[in-house]
Amino acid sequence: IEQLALQVSWADFNSPEQLEPEIDEQRLSASAIYTVPLADEGWWSTTIAWGLKDPSEDETMHAFALESAYAPDRDWTFFARSEVIESHELGSGGTIDTVGKISLGAIRDFHVMDNVKIGIGALYSVNSVPDELEPSYGGDPDGAMVFLRLVAGT
């Protein structure tokens, strides 16, 4: 299937964190991307990804992401992303916490040369944190941003 790309990787790190030099880690990740061309120079692409972090002195932690982007033509792209991660570095005394985030956004591209485009985009995100972390994070925070993107060579 030429529209499908698969990736698997594994790494063994000796002392990757300066604050915890005595801890080694193994990491594993896998992802799949499926992209389909659409009429009028458009496309649709979806990615699913998973990661595992296995510290030598702590529990194994997982991360998941699902994202999709839809470009009905060469000027617009609409996207959505959902992610969930487990981490012991979020402030609750070293326990593993699960946090999540959902983002929606759009980009409008302006073609300034044959192979150069500048895009202006915006996104809105909502985060989910466990109850014990809500005082530190101000509840389940949300946020928005506007950004510029430069793409050359396409």
Report each predicted region and the residues it spans:
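Detector for outer-membrane/organellar transmembrane beta-barrel domains
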Residues: 1-93, 102
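Extended hydrophobic secondary-structure segments that form protein cores and membrane-embedded regions
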Residues: 8-9, 48-50, 118-127
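Flexible, surface-exposed loop regions and adjacent strand-edge segments
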Residues: 23-25, 97, 135-141
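Flexible, glycine-rich linker and terminal segments associated
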Residues: 90, 115-120, 149-154
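Short, glycine/charged-rich beta-strand-loop motifs at protein surfaces that mediate ligand recognition
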Residues: 90-96, 107-109
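Outer-membrane beta-barrel "beta-signal"
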Residues: 104, 138-154
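C-terminal closing repeat unit and adjoining cap/tail of repeat-based domains
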Residues: 105-123
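Low-complexity, intrinsically disordered Gly/Pro/Thr-rich segments
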Residues: 128-135
